[in-house]
Amino acid sequence: NSKWLFADAYMAGKEAEVIAEYNAFLLQNGRGDYNVTTVLFDDQYVLLYYCLPIGYAQLYPEQYYVRGACALYDAIGRTITTVNACHAQLAESKRPKTYLFIRTNGGDNASLTYTKKMIWEMLERQQQKCGWEIFFVGCDVQTALAAAPTHKGINGAEDSQDDDYFDILRRLLERRKLSKEE
């Protein structure tokens, strides 16, 4: 039972595209026993879906809209904390494989609670101790990774520019699968 998490920064002018890509990704990956947790964030944090079976996690236009500044670190920190609290209630053998997909437009960071250093430490800990697979996609992701103290815990990253975000996720997952088989 795998869990797919999407932390997705609001992208002005690309709302319809994001909704279509998200729903297509779910449809293409909907075979299997997967649960989806979807987090939308900007200057607010919206836990849209929590552990919802993949077939019921579609995104609709009234759910996805642009508001204010992006609090990327706060959204990632809250998502990790929320999922850890859920996993702590499960026996270790029952904890699902977790994939964290973070989409960001590379814009401002209005976070108030978490710092960049705190987030990189949390991400590395989740990957090292809990086996999470963590993927970044967005604008200027490589620059963000280069600025990190370490990014050993990141399983994939790619700048998207105008590429299909979820197509990039599929490629990252495929590369990850192939590297594990070698």
Cite the ranges covered by each PLM segment.
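Acidic, low-complexity intrinsically disordered regions
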Residues: 1-182
